[in-house]
């Protein structure tokens, strides 16, 4: 179905792992313990584990806020939503697919941020931000991740590489889903 959909795409900004944190912009609807500005503001400048950019195609009549709202109001669009509610809000805790617990840390006008909890396969204290933007009608999703402290997986090069590759593929599925659902936003 996704292959048959019409979506014009422009090249997204390059993706990179290990890049230095950059402050986010946009309004704060909800911040978790002052950490909504990312690792530079919260964790002494910890480097990103990854930062991937995806094009969602052309949606000239849809704002980044509407795309973010489409995801948080219809969380079943999230590829591994598991036992999470259909609509998520800040401070919600739920299990993603595979019994991986997360907490919704923040929901801003154009971003969603979650954190892994104890019992998650990747360890606790991993923060993942989904930020939405639009340039000349082209929408983009930037997914960034950082951690409070190294985990068993991030200390192991093969596991860390596999985790980043898996994240890239998973968020690619999310971006393809949002590229289609943004028409309904």
What residues fall within each predicted segment?
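Structured segments of extracytoplasmic/periplasmic soluble domains
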Residues: 70-78, 135, 172, 176
């Amino acid at each position: 179905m996704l292959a048959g959909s019409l979506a014009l795409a422009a090249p997204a900004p390059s993706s990179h792992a290990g890049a230095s944190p950059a402050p986010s912009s946009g309004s704060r609807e909800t911040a978790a313990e002052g950490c909504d500005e990312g690792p530079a503001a919260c964790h002494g400048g910890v480097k990103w584990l990854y930062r991937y950019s995806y094009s969602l195609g052309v949606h000239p009549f849809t704002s980044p806020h509407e795309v973010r709202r489409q995801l948080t109001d219809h969380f079943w669009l999230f590829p591994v939503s598991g036992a999470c509610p259909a609509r998520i809000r800040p401070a919600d805790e739920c299990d993603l697919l595979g019994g991986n617990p997360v907490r919704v840390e923040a929901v801003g006008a154009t971003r969603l941020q979650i954190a892994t909890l104890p019992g998650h396969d990747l360890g606790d204290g991993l923060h993942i931000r989904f930020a939405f933007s639009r340039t000349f009608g082209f929408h983009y999703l930037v997914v960034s991740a950082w951690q409070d402290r190294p985990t068993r997986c991030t200390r192991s090069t093969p596991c860390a590489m596999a985790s980043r590759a898996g994240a890239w593929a998973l968020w690619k599925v999310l971006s393809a889903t949002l590229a289609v659902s943004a028409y309904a936003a």
